Amino acid sequence: MEASKKKMKFPSAFSILFIILLIAIGLTWLIPSGSYSKLSYDTTEHHFIVKTHGIPDQSYPATEQTLNQLNIKIQLSNFTNGIIKKPIAIPDTYQRIEQHEKGITDMIHAMVDGTIEVADIMIFIFILGGMIGVINKTGAFNAGLMSLTKKTKGNEFSVVFAVCVLMLLGGTACGIEEEAVAFYPILVPVFLALGYDSIVCVGAIFLAASMGTAFSTINPFSVVIASNAAGIPFTEGMGFRTLGLILGGACVIAYMYWYCKKLRANPEFSYTYDDRQAFYDLYMKDIDPNATVEFTFRRKLILILFSGAFPLMVWGVMFGGWWFPQMATSFLAITIIIMFISGLPEKDVVNGFTHGASELVGVALIIGLARAVNIILEQGMISDTILDYMTHLVDGMNGGVFIIGQLIVFIFLGLVVPSSSGLAVLAMPIMAPLADTVGIPRDIVVSAYNWGQYIMLFLAPTGLVLVTLQMLGIPFNKWLKFVMPIVGCQFVISSILLLAQVFMYAQ
C-alpha cells in the first residue's frame, strides 16, 4: 500500500467539455423541443422573411406596418442598414414541435462541425502563435523584458493596473472577448518577469476585459444590438451602465491589488503554485531573465511592429468592420515584415513560425469543442423552449422582483446561448415587452441582459473560460477559487443598480 495517495486532479478542459456535450445530448431527450417563428431581412429582395417550423417560409413587405403587426418594436432602419443581421424571435409565436433527440453520432458530427464553424478564429490563433514564435527567435522579447523589469522595479503593480484599465476600456467600448487571446503572448512574459503568476495574467486580461464587457457602454456586439432589438436607443440607461463600469472596474483592480500584494509577500500564496514550473517553462523557456541581451534598434523596431498590431486590431473591429479573417490578415502581414527585418536565416524564421503555431493547437481545438455544445442545443431545438419557460417564470411580477428575476434568467441563458449578439436577438424581442407589463423602462431589461449573461461569462465552460485556462495551463477548479469573489461582487453591484433604476423610475 502506498504511503500517500496521489492527489486527485481536476479534469482537463477537453474532458470538461466532453462531459458537457454528453449532458447536452441528455437534455435533448428531457426538454421538449420547441421553436419561435423568426424574422429576417432579405438584403437582395428587400423584404422580410418569416421562418416557422413545419411550414414554408413567408414573405412580408419590409415596412414599419409589418413590424407592428408582428409586435416587433424595432425600427425598420435597424434591419435595412445592417445593424441587425441575425433572425429575430417573434413574440407570442412559440410552439411545441416534434422531439429532436440527439445521440453519440450527432455529438461526434457536432465536434467536427463546430471546429469548421470557428475555423476563422483558429486560423487567427495559429497566425498569432506563429508571430510569437518568430519574435522569440529574434531575441526581441528577451531584450524588451529585461528593459521593462529594470524600469518598473519597485512599482510592479503599475503594469497590472495599466493593463486592467486598458482591458476595461476595450471591453466596454468594443466587447473584447475572443480578441483578448491575442494579448496573452505579449503580456504573460511581462507579468512573469515582474514576479507574478498565471492567475495575475488571466486576472489582468480576461477578468478585466470581461468586467468591462459586462458593463458595456457603447459595445456594438451586446448593448447596442440588444437596445435595437428592444426597440430603444442604446443611449438609454447609459448613466447607470457607466456607473456600473466604474464600480466593477474598481472591484477588479482592488481585488488584483490584494492578490498581487499577497503573492509578492509569499509566492506560495499563489493559487497555482503547484503548476508554476510548467507555466513558467511554457512562456519563459526561450527567455533567460538573467541574461544580458542588447536591446538593439532592430529589436525595438520588431517590438514596435508587434505592439502596433493590437491597437490596429481594435481600430479595425470598432471602425473598419473587421472580424477574424481581417485580423488574421493584418497579423500575418506584420509577421512577414518582421521576418524580413529580423536578419535571421529563412529556415530559422519559418521554423519559429511553425513551432509557435503548433503550441496553440490545443487552444484552437477547445474553441471548436465549445462550439459543438451550442450546435447540439440548437439542433435539439431546446434553446427556445428554455427561453419560453424563463419568460413565463418572470411574467407578472412586481418591478423589483421582476428585474432581479430577469437578471437571474439571463445568467442562466448566458450558459445556454453564450453569444452576446445571439442572445440579444433571440431573447430581447421576447423579454423587453414584459417590462411594459410591469411598468418599467425597457433599458433596465437591456442592462439585466448584459449584466446577467456576463456574470455567467466568468464561469461558463461553453464560453471563453476554458480557452483562456487551456492557454495558460490553469485548472478550472483553481480558476473558480479565484473568480468567485468577483462573481459575487458583480451580482451585488448589478442587483443594486437594477433596483435603484426601478425605484427611481417609480418615483
Regions found by a protein language model. Give the residues of each.
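Long, contiguous bundles of hydrophobic transmembrane helices that form the permeation core
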Residues: E2-F14, S35-V50, D57, G239-G352, ...
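Membrane-core helix-loop-helix motifs of multi-pass transport proteins
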Residues: E2-I16, Y184-D274, V293-K300, G463-L497, ...
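C-terminal transmembrane helix pair
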Residues: P11, V394-Q507
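Core transmembrane alpha-helical segments of multi-pass membrane transporters/permeases
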Residues: A13-L22, V50-N142, W322-T385
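Hydrophobic core segments of alpha-helical transmembrane domains in multi-pass membrane transport
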Residues: I16-L30, I125-G133, L166-G170, G212, ...
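Membrane-interfacial loop-to-helix junctions in multi-pass transporters
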Residues: I116-M122, K150-A162, L194-V200, A357-A364, ...
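Alpha-helical transmembrane segments of multi-pass membrane proteins
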Residues: I125, E156-G171, Y196-A214, G237, ...
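Hydrophobic alpha-helical transmembrane segments of multi-pass integral membrane proteins
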Residues: F126, N155-I186, I367-A370, L377, ...
